[in-house]
Amino acid sequence: MPFLRIKIYSTDLEELNRVVEKIKEIVKQTGVKMRGPIPLPTKILRVPVLRITGHRGTKIWDTYQMRIHRRIIDIATDDRTIKLLMRTPLITKPEKIQIQLKYIKDKNL
């Protein structure tokens, strides 16, 4: 049975969880099979920056980091579910959330 794989990326964990809960509500309303949300490892991007050279030539570094949280949800394909997912405004802050949809054939859910 074909299914829809939804990958969600965000730097804001609360917003990510809110979107995942909204997707779970839509799937529960339609009654299709769902697997997930599967949390993937958090990607941490670090940027070391030389702040100043201290007393006697010692170097002082600042480190800035950005955490990217990821989730995967697999949903059995159903026309009604896909239409509801596309029509419902899932994201309130689009600059913080990225969603990828992938249609996968011939795999059991």
UniProtKB/Swiss-Prot annotation:
GO CC annotations, alphabetized: small ribosomal subunit
Alphabetical keyword list: Ribonucleoprotein, Ribosomal protein
Record GO terms (molecular function): structural constituent of ribosome; tRNA binding
Assembly notes: Part of the 30S ribosomal subunit.
Described purpose of this protein according to its UniProt entry: Involved in the binding of tRNA to the ribosomes.
Protein family per UniProt: Belongs to the universal ribosomal protein uS10 family.
Designated name of the protein: Small ribosomal subunit protein uS10
